[in-house]
Swiss-Prot record:
<comment type="pathway">
    <text>Pyrimidine metabolism; UMP biosynthesis via de novo pathway; UMP from orotate: step 2/2.</text>
</comment>
<keyword id="KW-0210">Decarboxylase</keyword>
<dbReference type="GO" id="GO:0044205">
    <property type="term" value="P:'de novo' UMP biosynthetic process"/>
</dbReference>
<dbReference type="Pfam" id="PF00215">
    <property type="entry name" value="OMPdecase"/>
</dbReference>
<dbReference type="InterPro" id="IPR011995">
    <property type="entry name" value="OMPdecase_type-2"/>
</dbReference>
<dbReference type="InterPro" id="IPR018089">
    <property type="entry name" value="OMPdecase_AS"/>
</dbReference>
<keyword id="KW-0665">Pyrimidine biosynthesis</keyword>
<dbReference type="InterPro" id="IPR011060">
    <property type="entry name" value="RibuloseP-bd_barrel"/>
</dbReference>
<feature type="active site" description="Proton donor">
    <location>
        <position position="95"/>
    </location>
</feature>
<dbReference type="GO" id="GO:0004590">
    <property type="term" value="F:orotidine-5'-phosphate decarboxylase activity"/>
</dbReference>
<dbReference type="InterPro" id="IPR001754">
    <property type="entry name" value="OMPdeCOase_dom"/>
</dbReference>
<dbReference type="InterPro" id="IPR013785">
    <property type="entry name" value="Aldolase_TIM"/>
</dbReference>
<keyword id="KW-0456">Lyase</keyword>
<comment type="similarity">
    <text>Belongs to the OMP decarboxylase family. Type 2 subfamily.</text>
</comment>
<protein>
    <recommendedName>
        <fullName>Orotidine 5'-phosphate decarboxylase</fullName>
        <ecNumber>4.1.1.23</ecNumber>
    </recommendedName>
</protein>
<dbReference type="GO" id="GO:0006207">
    <property type="term" value="P:'de novo' pyrimidine nucleobase biosynthetic process"/>
</dbReference>
Length: 272
């Protein structure tokens, strides 16, 4: 199955638009795992097992693994998700952006080394920097558009021909880049008006939406702005609020409770 097919199936099977971000901060791991060998993998595995029936995707953030020399644990984690919870797509949050020859190796890293189902990329260097990822027809390519951080406005709101740059990215994705139907866009929950504008531009293209939970994005406004006609179309990401719901031995159960509450809150507004 392609990434988009897996995602659509997960939306329906788990009745969920929730994506759980896997950002394992060694300073916030449960006390029972502190200092243990393979602690990052063990922590993420417990979170995955506790939430897999509640999500439409998992999103490991590559920097949290690389900074701890835990690339092997990231490989192990993605393999584990695919083996233990087949049908749940894994988005490698790498935000890569470089010239074509280097991008070829980043694509190899994401799709052949880590076996991710999708990867996040930056459009700043243009379409040729994204082509190596699109050469993998079964994988997803999720392009930064209107990010959730306040500083994103420094560039994304620059006016070009009377339009903010983020809108031009959305238009390019719809009109020129997404020829194989593999693309999605990143649009932050902290900017619901922009979510609605991007949805208007790109139709049913999937949106990865960070920024709820610890970043303060409003779930009701996010869902109403970004949902498609059938009440899907989004991967609404929450990381810290779920991962670090507890530092005690009940951390996985606590994470599940927060994930369940978040999914149910999202679902309250999907069709209303």
């Amino acid at each position: 199955m392609t990434f988009t097919e897996q995602l659509a199936a997960a939306w329906q099977r788990n009745d969920s638009l929730l994506c759980v971000g896997l950002d394992p901060d060694p300073h916030k791991l449960p006390l029972s795992l502190t200092g243990a060998g393979g602690a990052i993998f063990s922590f993420c595995r417990e979170i995955v097992d506790a939430t897999a029936d509640l999500v439409c995707a998992f999103k490991p953030q590559i920097a949290y693994f690389h900074s701890q020399r835990a690339e092997d644990q990231l490989e192990q984690l993605i393999h584990y998700i695919h083996d233990a919870h087949p049908g749940i797509p894994v988005i490698l949050d790498a935000k890569r952006g470089d010239i074509g020859s280097t991008a070829e190796h980043y694509a190899l890293e994401a799709f052949e080394r880590y076996k991710a189902d999708a990867v996040t990329v930056s459009p700043y260097m243009g379409f040729d920097s994204m082509q190596p990822y699109l050469a993998y027809p079964e994988r997803g390519v999720i392009v930064l558009c209107r990010t959730s951080n306040p500083g994103g406005s420094d560039v994304q709101f620059l006016q070009v021909d009377g339009k903010p740059l983020y809108q031009l990215v959305a238009e390019a994705a719809r009109e020129r880049w997404n020829t194989t139907g593999q693309m999605g866009l990143v649009v932050g929950a902290t900017f619901p008006n922009e979510i609605a504008r991007v949805r208007q531009i790109v139709g049913d293209m999937p949106l990865l939406i960070p920024g709820i939970g610890a970043q303060g994005g409003d779930i009701e406004a996010t869902v109403k702005a970004g949902r498609t006609a059938d009440g899907t179309g989004m991967m609404i990401n929450s990381s810290r609020a779920i991962l670090y719901a507890s530092r005690e031995k009940d951390f996985a159960a606590a994470a599940r409770n927060v994930a369940l509450q978040t999914r149910e809150t999202i679902n309250r507004y999907r069709h209303g």
